[in-house]
Amino acid sequence: YSQRCGFVVYGGWPAAMEISEVSLAGEAGGEAFRLPVRATVLSGGVGSTAATHPYRMMMGRAWTLLKSGNLKQLLLKAKRYRAGKPGTHGDVVAAVRRQLEKNNCSRFMLVLDHDLGGGANNYREGLIRERMADGCGTLLLSFHLLSLQYSLEICTPGGRQRFSISGLDVLISLAEEGLISESFYNNAVSFEHPEDVPDLLVTLRSVYAIPLTLAMHDYYPICPSHFLLDASERYCGVPDIETCSDCLPKIDFWFVSFFESRDIRLWRSKWGACLESADSVLCFSNATRDLLLRAYPDLNTDRIDVVPHATGFFPARKPKLDMSTGLHIGILGEIGPHKGCDIVKALSEEIVTQNAATRISVIGTLEADCDPAVVTETGPYEASGLVDLVEASGANVFLFPSIWPETFSYVVDELMQLDVPIVCFDMGAPAERLRHYPKGKLIPLANARDILSQLKVFHEELARPMVIGE
């Protein structure tokens, strides 16, 4: 792989030719090195194999960050993706036994999670810390994208040790040895052959009686398009299965390509069995529960637990917002494609088209190239500094531009704690929260002109010859 060896080999051949093996051969000594075709061959000039799609996706996002001048953010993302590289090969079962004896534990909890960052990873790390505080350990199964390998990390109070494993069968071996106390599915987005994950969890539950909890951080158990975005990259609303069957093969973004069959009936069959076998399906909002039941109407609701995330942001004071200066849109967070960066870009272009005085302040980062006369960006922030950042920005109405029905939003919670006006699209957990928030407004996901118009109307409703706040 180019990211490890430092060079790239490329070539071409007739499209009709089937490639079964590619090797590098040294001219002098004749040494040969076989290349893994699935991971290296770009066919038809576009890299259409499932294994290469994440690389193309990440390159596209990297180019977007470069164009927008977000070099620091690009470096942070690159560092995150390179982290978590699988460690040494070895006898994992023996290593787990040694750590159990060393920590005086009988069994470890197994956690399945991606390594893509974000709220799901933060939640997982919280679980691991809780186990460590109790003197116990955790087995963390992940899939490392840059090396296309599974890793199993043994996490104990004494440290963390990461192993490279060949596949999911290793977990069956650990179960046979009685080394797993419970399974916790956190997230499997980006896992290779993701349809094998529910089969594994069902086996651990049914054959080895290992209790299972599934956490709904996104909608992966409903669809490989885990944000529920259809082929046109719009929220689908979980339609009938025929519509899904027509849509899924057309989707070419995110990690959908890892599910090579693109058969939504097969996907729902496997994940439906997994959901039925779970002891608890953990939802962080009623909106998530409702969408899950729309996809699986026969699912036993007794096993669904709605438990909102605990939040710890309580500002010492509320920011002062000046409503007399005209509409100034504030946006908080790390705004990538599914978080609405295209919405922000379209809004900025509409502001230019209308020659409006409206400005947009992004407190955080934005993966879009916008007119700097309209859009300013602070870069990453700490919650402790939010009050000062909000006041310094001049923003007086905040837009939450996410285009998918988020299962929970820490950003919305932070904005509510700041007691500022918030606008979001009428979907998911954010809408559920803002529906009962005095300074909240729900709007349909529409074109930039309509969104800007709704924001202006909301600002006019709020505007008075006074300063809101303390």
Language model features with spans:
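Basic, ligand-binding patches in group-transfer machinery
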Residues: 1-69, 76, 94-95
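A short, glycine/small-residue-rich beta-strand->loop->alpha-helix junction that serves as a flexible
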Residues: 99-100, 104-105, 111-126, 190-192, ...
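Membrane-proximal helix-turn-helix segments that form the acceptor-binding/catalytic region
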Residues: 206-207, 237-280
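Helix-loop-beta element that forms the nucleotide-linked donor phosphate-binding surface
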Residues: 273-277, 289-311
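Conserved donor-binding/catalytic core segment of Leloir-type glycosyltransferases
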Residues: 282, 322-339, 345-348
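Nucleotide-activated donor-binding/catalytic signature segment of Leloir-type glycosyltransferases, i.e.
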Residues: 364-394
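Short alpha-helical segment that forms part of, or immediately flanks, the ligand-binding pocket
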Residues: 387, 412-417, 431-432
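Short hydrophobic beta-strand element within catalytic cores of glycosyltransferases
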Residues: 397-398, 421-424
